[in-house]
Amino acid sequence: RPNPNGTIIDGPILEKEHTSFVGMHEIPVLHGMTIGEYAKMINGEKWLKDSLQCDLKVAPCLNYSHDMKYSLPVKPSPNLPNDQAINLYASLCFFEGTNVSVGRGTEKQFQIYGSPFLSNFNYSFRPISNFGAKEPMHKDILCIGEDLSQIKKVTRLELTWLIKAYTDTSDKTVFF
């Protein structure tokens, strides 16, 4: 399938010692590849277990080019409800592992961020238990932060929000 962020190649390359379920290979956060291109890379680089290589056949996406806008027909996750969240995910995922919520437990997952430890922002939300997040970070606690749901499409990895939140947090020892 096409990549909804297929025009963007940006961000740090994952270091091998930090691989996990959400980051398995040494590629940039925003890699710009289709699933087929990524599969070919995995196969060609022998990244499968024991350097296994497959007899891989990839059906090309007809009339597709990387500069085309593509909207996923099915949500990839309950926490990525729309094109805006999908576009912002690569920039907001850096809040994972911090004390800042990315909106799980709200209607604007990966379109907002906030924390009870922030104060110099004019947006607030209170995460609650829902289908996509039974126990969201800061459940039932008022979070102060920023609403990004109406900003223009991001065309690069955007670290401004992470830096703003870190700068504003009242206790930097609990940020990361």
Where are these regions (language model features)?
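Conserved anion/nucleotide-ligand pocket segment
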Residues: 18-92
